[in-house]
Every structure is written in structure tokens, then in C-alpha cells.
Amino acid sequence: MAKEPARVKRRERKNITSGVAHVNASFNNTMVTITDAQGNTISWSSAGLMGFKGSRKSTPYAAQMAAEDAGRKAAEHGVRTLEVNVSGPGSGRESALRALQAVGMTITTIRDVTPIPHNGCRPPKRRRV
């Protein structure tokens, strides 16, 4: 007996006008997640998802591509205005912001939410090149 083809659940279109973009720029990758005000994910993208591998993931261009992709996906759900929370020390922070504006999003606020230790864990040792 032949198997019945699996039904693929279609992604429903959410009508959300404003959202929050969480840009996590680490030393190795840049991840962009766009959520609604409650924190439910609308769309997300990362430099690795865009096909960059290794050290190319940490470039500003890779962050720009990831932010454009996440912004386009969010625009399909009706997102027009964004609050941006930027986290991390990576090189893709500013380019991700510019890419979100280039997609046509209106950025209302930019917040730096990088966690700063009050002398917590010992940092990794310095690189000797």
C-alpha cells in the first residue's frame, strides 16, 4: 500500500505592524531574530544560514545579508517598524542596522543590551599571532 504524502503545514501570515529586532553579533557569527512585542519569533536569519562558512561568517557583509533576509521575511508578515536590541562585540553590528533600514523598516529605537560582567568569569587568554 502506497504511503499518503505528508501534509506540509503552511506558515500563516501574521499581521503585525511593529516588532523587535534582536541582533546578536558574536565574534564568530551574526544572528538576527525579529519578534513581536511579547517575544514570539516572526523571522530569523544568521550569517551561517546565508551560506557563509568559517571566518567569513564574522564579516560585516555576512551580517548585512542575514539582516536583509530576516527583514524581508518579517515584511511578509506585515512588520513595518522595529525596535532594535544589539548585543555582542562582533563586527556586524552597524551593517545589520543599515541593512534593516535598507529593506524598508522604520527603526524607532536602538538599544545596546550587551551583557557586561561586574568582574565575573575570567576572559579567554590573549591571542598571540
Swiss-Prot record:
Any one Gene Ontology molecular-function term assigned to this protein's record: structural constituent of ribosome
**Which BP terms from GO are recorded?**
translation
Q: Does the keyword Lipoprotein apply?
A: no
Signal peptide bounds: none
Q: Which InterPro entries match?
A: Ribosomal_uS11, Ribosomal_uS11_bac-type, Ribosomal_uS11_CS, Ribosomal_uS11_sf
Give GO cellular component annotations, separated by semicolons: ribonucleoprotein complex; ribosome
Supply the alphabetized keyword list: Ribonucleoprotein, Ribosomal protein, RNA-binding, rRNA-binding
Its biological purpose is as follows: Located on the platform of the 30S subunit, it bridges several disparate RNA helices of the 16S rRNA. Forms part of the Shine-Dalgarno cleft in the 70S ribosome.
Outline the subunit composition. Answer: Part of the 30S ribosomal subunit. Interacts with proteins S7 and S18. Binds to IF-3.
- Cited HAMAP family: Ribosomal_uS11 (MF_01310)
The name of this protein is: Small ribosomal subunit protein uS11
Source species: Phenylobacterium zucineum (strain HLK1)
